[in-house]
Amino acid sequence: MSMPYDNEAKIKQAVILLQKIVNDTSVPRNIRRAATDAIRNLQDLGLSPAVRAANAIGILEDISQDPNMPTHARISIWNVVSILETVKD
């Protein structure tokens, strides 16, 4: 019964963490752009929570291998992916 709320809370937490990456000027622009795209996917209410999470995970996994990514940003992205992997319909 409380599953939809839990999913939305997880998505909201992921968006907050991604927003920190977007606002961090020490993170390369392409990585901040990918984080912005992931946020946009997570906020698309036309899709189910699991689909939104899967779309964002795809974007974040692609960018997480970037050799120019600072370590703190990579760890944050891994944390976001871990949160989003628990979102189920």
Swiss-Prot record:
What intrachain disulfides are recorded? none
Q: Where are the transmembrane segments?
A: none
From what superkingdom does this record's organism come?
A: Archaea
Q: Which Gene3D superfamilies does the entry mention?
A: Ta0600-like
Q: Which family does it belong to?
A: Belongs to the UPF0147 family.
Quote the protein name from its UniProt record: UPF0147 protein SSO6503
Q: What is the lineage of its organism?
A: Archaea, Thermoproteota, Thermoprotei, Sulfolobales, Sulfolobaceae
